[in-house]
Amino acid sequence: MTATGRRLRADAERSVQAILEAAERVLKEDPAATLEQIAEAAGVARTTVHRRFANRDALLAALAESAWRQIAGAVEGARPATAPPLVALHQATANILAIKSGWTFALGQPATNEEIGRLQQAVYAACDEVFRRAQQAGDIRAGVDLAWARQVYLALINETAHGPTGGGEPDAAAARILDVLFHGIG
């Protein structure tokens, strides 16, 4: 899609995707990399990058938005409102871990536009819904502060994805996260 909401041609969509993927790789290695370096890594002309993104800030916003769109889709795919809470939580966790490792730089960027903020809020709201449902089902004690539980859960995901041991296989890592979240380490 363009900034005006028009759909891009298939070849233009591929170029944008190649630029975003290259930007993630290049910027993860060198956050000060230029648009020219990103164009080279994407295998496109510098003018193609400038035609698709008005400036570096626009590219960074598109990068973060693309990553958050994938996270939101992964969470939605776990059926947080209808699947049994622990099943939805496990699936969402595995889905997020599979995405997070590929978008380290993008997901570390602040929300710079309304769409990124909306996507983040949708992800957090789905998480809160699953936690509420898990508490109603008795999987989380009645007195637990669910906002705090979400913070702990997100910290576990982040540490798993970016910590020194790496995430490993997403399904096994999700099981490990939920085991620590629900049973502690004691």
Predicted regions located by residue number:
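Amphipathic alpha-helical interaction segments
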Residues: A18, Q37, A58, V87-Q91, ...
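Short hydrophobic/aromatic patch on the recognition helix
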Residues: G43-F53
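Amphipathic, non-transmembrane alpha-helical scaffold segments
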Residues: A12, A64, W68, I116-Y124
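Alpha-helical DNA-contacting segments of helix-turn-helix folds
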Residues: F53, L60-A67
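Basic, helix-initiating cap at the start of DNA-binding domains
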Residues: M1-E29, A33-A41, A58
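All-alpha amphipathic helical-bundle segments outside canonical DNA-binding/catalytic cores
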Residues: V87, E115-L119, Q136-V152, G168-A173
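C-terminal peripheral helix-coil segments that are non-catalytic and often amphipathic
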Residues: M1-A3, Q91, Q121, A125, ...
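Hydrophobic alpha-helical connector segments
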Residues: A62, G73-S101, T112-E115
